[in-house]
Amino acid sequence: VNLWQVDIRPADGQPDSLGVQAESAARELGISNRLQIQGIHGFLVQGSLDAPSASKMAREYLADPIAQRVETALVGDPKLSAYGGDSKQLVHVLLKPGVMDPVAQSTLQMLKGLGFAADEVRTFRKYWISGHPSGESEVISRLASRVLSNDSIEQIVLGPLKMDKLSIGAPYSLTLTRVPIDQLNDKELMELSKSGQLYFSLPEMQQIQSYYRQIGRQPTDIELETIAQTWSEHCSHKTLGGRIQYQDENGTRQFSSMLKETIFAATKKIRETLGANDWCVSVFKDNAGVVTFDKEHHIVFKVETHNHPSAIEPYGGANTGLGGVIRDPLGTGLGAKPICSTDVFCFAAPNYPPDELPPGVLHPRRVISGVVSGVRDYGNRMGIPTVNGAVYFDDRYLGNPLVYCGNAGLLPVDKVEKKPHAGDWIVALGGRTGRDGIHGATFSSVELTSESESISGGAVQIGNAITEKMVLEVILQA
């Protein structure tokens, strides 16, 4: 079994988009205005491939023969470093182990279908950097962590890659783990909540402790994770659904459930007032709202936010924000056809002084670029246009941007209702569970801090538009 590295670079006369983007970001973030950066992307392919097969694979199927050139060799071969020159700092950027790599998955599927003996594939980016003073490692370190990579999901390798195989992870065997909480004091309960990324409040932890004392046993780790997910802000809207006292110039109002007593109540009253002219079909009961359109179709519409994920991994956060909201009309009734998307973004000013950024906060320019690219790319891969949007700037969004993604779909008038029955099959489709996306729901219940990127980086899921596109086609045909 060999491990081949395929470097794909621009052909002579073609623009170096990766290098240009990195140089621009380095200037904008105040890292350096003297750097010259060359960038390429590539694949690591593991399998029983000889040199002629690897060369054919790379030349004919992994690169554009007109706009790109390839260099194929076993990992560690010196010629893989020659393109940028020996005097330049070489930096590789790879996804961390366990993070889903949709491009690699699609590539592996293609190569196997073409008859190549490929077992595993990984993607990477590669940069050669010059123009910094000799020995000024701080510049390279800042550039690598703030421009070339995102530490929440990616890792940096300085110099040539040194490996002889791709790690595919360790085998997993279920071990029943019980968490002893019956004798924990309040401080220890909150330490457990934080260390486990459960993000319960103290009263919630006390309630869980009380319940398991009553039934006479300790909870399993899976039970705690399940309760944390169900009670999270993301899933239960604790803030909007909670008891709130509101005071203004007109006095004080007490809400037992703010969401039910405002938005829900107002909608119900308007529908009752309209009577026979009510154009709402399904409200607050399915994955998306449904309103009348014509004799054959209803309009399905849903908007959701993806703020916390976009704050620590802008591209992935916005990418899965749109992917998730496309899923909602698709899962409404017996399945609506998503036809267009919309968005609203709220950011801090793009010219915010880099040296005034709080610890752990990404610069607004990087957030803006990542969010816009994430929404654009996912919609393009799904074949669903983003037809309108809005942007608002205010420095109060520095630590946590607002990223609203919406989608509209068409639903046949006779496909509004669905009812599951005992014996129905439940089918899970998508990427295997990996490092990404873990604690994505509970992450919504905690405030962002300077440690969020390192502690909760894995909470941001990697989108897989290619798989969702296939799921969409299957559901609509069914």
Where are these regions (language model features)?
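Core nucleic-acid recognition elements
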Residues: 1-478
